[in-house]
Amino acid sequence: MSIEIANIKKSFGRTQVLNDISLDIPSGQMVALLGPSGSGKTTLLRIIAGLEHQTSGHIRFHGTDVSRLHARDRKVGFVFQHYALFRHMTVFDNITFGLTVLPRRERPNAAAIKAKVTKLLEMVQLAHLADRYPAQLSGGQKQRVALARALAVEPQILLLDEPFGALDAQVRKELRRWLRQLHEELKFTSVFVTHDQEEATEVADRVVVMSQGNIEQADAPNQVWREPATRFVLEFMGEVNRLQGTIRGGQFHVGAHRWPLGYTPAYQGPVDLFLRPWEVDISRRTSLDSPLPVQVLEASPKGHYTQLVVQPLGWYNEPLTVVMHGDDAPQHGERLFVGLQHARLYNGDERIETRDEELALAQSA
């Protein structure tokens, strides 16, 4: 079941929380709405579900406008962060509930309901807990029950509002893998809200990064990491070094160091430089690619690579986080050399293109 979000705006009083949002979600895709608090991601999810109504715009499921349909008529499954299980019902009865309250013409008979719930319990790996009550379950088990209950009525679309937010880190990781496997098996269309970058990129087919009621980028997880569309996406995804410098003529100056950009940008003046740890050139010997001396402050082996915190020597004040590959991990206090050639430069929110990027843009024009 595909979802079309067309020009959705939403305001609460004088506060605009969604600004002309448009997004197409193909059938069978799992999409993460990722952003900080106040970005509008949960409001958008609730509008898709019919739990909130947009100020303007349309929601279409497989081409049919459902904008005015009540939530119960949209055939959407919704999983909340805090489970919302019935405390006085067993696991089996919690999952059964949605089926028993269907209109008579849609309601399966008792035998069919029992068979379906039994199958769902096996699918969510809780068949041995069918007779227990919510108070007797762990957080991860409760969330599996909530998901099985949502799937019992065979929703056209599954929506999840920070489904793992109340769980500890290890349980979250296990449930993320399990949800992804379940999605691969059932191929349902799903949209989930999260503020966790790792969760979004690990589980989703596509990540929609939101900020202040706008979509900053909607792309495959790897693309969001490697080719952030805006400065906000670059910074929000985390693991990024930021240095302050200046463009003068055709050169970029940072501290006592400078290097040629290969052309003279129209903009001249202060800029911010961004580099993810694995984008920093690093070597034990000075070279054209790695001319800047640094000293190792911390070294954290991660298996096939080592994550380092290094202090620039004489050319910048703040430490950098870098990644060095290989088994021969540097020691605390060791001198290394880094290069910043792969940096992204920004004047405020405006990207300053490098020479290679300028050529690529010219060739594609």
Curated annotation (Swiss-Prot):
Residues binding ATP: 35-42
Annotated Gene Ontology cellular component terms: ATP-binding cassette (ABC) transporter complex
One term of GO molecular function: ATP hydrolysis activity
Membrane topology annotation: Peripheral membrane protein
Catalytic reaction(s) noted: sulfate(out) + ATP + H2O = sulfate(in) + ADP + phosphate + H(+); thiosulfate(out) + ATP + H2O = thiosulfate(in) + ADP + phosphate + H(+)
Domain ABC transporter residue range list: 3-237
Enzyme class: translocase
Keyword Hydrolase: no
EC number per UniProt: 7.3.2.3
Subcellular localization(s) per the UniProt record: Cell inner membrane
Top-rank lineage group of the source organism: Bacteria
Keywords: ATP-binding, Cell inner membrane, Cell membrane, Membrane, Nucleotide-binding, Sulfate transport, Translocase, Transport
Subunit structure: The complex is composed of two ATP-binding proteins (CysA), two transmembrane proteins (CysT and CysW) and a solute-binding protein (CysP).
PANTHER family: SPERMIDINE/PUTRESCINE IMPORT ATP-BINDING PROTEIN POTA, SPERMIDINE_PUTRESCINE IMPORT ATP-BINDING PROTEIN POTA
Annotated family: Belongs to the ABC transporter superfamily. Sulfate/tungstate importer (TC 3.A.1.6) family.
Primary role: Part of the ABC transporter complex CysAWTP involved in sulfate/thiosulfate import. Responsible for energy coupling to the transport system.
This protein's name: Sulfate/thiosulfate import ATP-binding protein CysA
